[in-house]
């Protein structure tokens, strides 16, 4: 029975599925990430209205160029996130505020133009997981790097750090950390598309080490400039 269950899950990952599409500008949504989105494009609002009458599942995929108003298949990245709508609020100006939760990584296949919105064929993607001990060690290192970064970068709330420290799954830990790091959209998407959890953790650890180093250099420069200014003022 156990083997049958594993095979069933594996096969499901290779089944072509279909959902309405919501193209995103300037944000990458990771699995387990809960985030509010403000939606204004007609096709996107129609897609949301459609899924609210069914199972509330929608496919989120980031645009390569946020300036494009009516994106085609080549205008979005190759991987997105199967997500669920937690809450939807229609605003007075005609736009929509929606609270979404990322669920699973998905490979984007084809766009299907409906009358009022876009649907998308896709396949779910599995994480590539190595030995548990190695992943747990890397997860602990990643959390320590995040603690250090949080102590010098006030843009990351302490509540975020505490919620990540409560996580047990290395894949979820890597995704939650990546979603809060200061990276370009293409850099974030590259980490999103890293299905090997060990490599994903390695990547975010390097990003955090680099960001910590940059912040340290900036602080030292500001300190030297401040000291020089104070010295100049004393001389006058």
Q: How would you describe each model-predicted region?
A:
Residues 6-236:
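N-terminal low-complexity, acidic/polar interaction/targeting segments
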């Amino acid at each position: 029975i156990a083997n049958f269950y594993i095979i069933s899950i594996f096969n499901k990952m290779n089944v072509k599925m279909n959902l309405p599409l919501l193209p995103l500008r300037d944000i990458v949504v990771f699995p387990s990430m809960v985030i509010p989105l403000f939606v204004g494009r007609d096709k996107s609002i129609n897609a949301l209205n459609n899924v609210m009458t069914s199972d509330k599942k929608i496919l989120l995929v980031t645009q390569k160029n946020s300036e494009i108003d009516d994106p085609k298949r080549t205008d979005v990245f190759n991987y997105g996130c199967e997500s669920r709508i937690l809450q939807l609020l229609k605003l007075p100006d005609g736009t929509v505020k929606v609270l979404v939760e990322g669920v699973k990584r998905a490979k984007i296949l084809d766009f299907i133009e409906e009358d009022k919105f876009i649907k998308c064929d896709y396949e779910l993607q599995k994480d590539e997981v190595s030995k548990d001990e190695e992943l747990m060690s890397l997860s602990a290192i990643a959390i320590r790097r995040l603690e250090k970064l949080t102590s010098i970068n006030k843009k990351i709330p302490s509540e975020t750090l505490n919620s990540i420290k409560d996580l047990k799954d290395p894949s979820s830990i890597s995704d939650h950390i990546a979603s809060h790091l200061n990276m370009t959209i293409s850099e974030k998407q590259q980490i999103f598309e890293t299905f090997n959890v060990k490599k994903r953790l390695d990547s975010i650890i390097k990003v955090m080490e680099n960001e910590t180093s940059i912040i340290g250099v900036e602080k030292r420069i500001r300190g030297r400039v401040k000291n020089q200014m104070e010295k100049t003022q004393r001389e006058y």
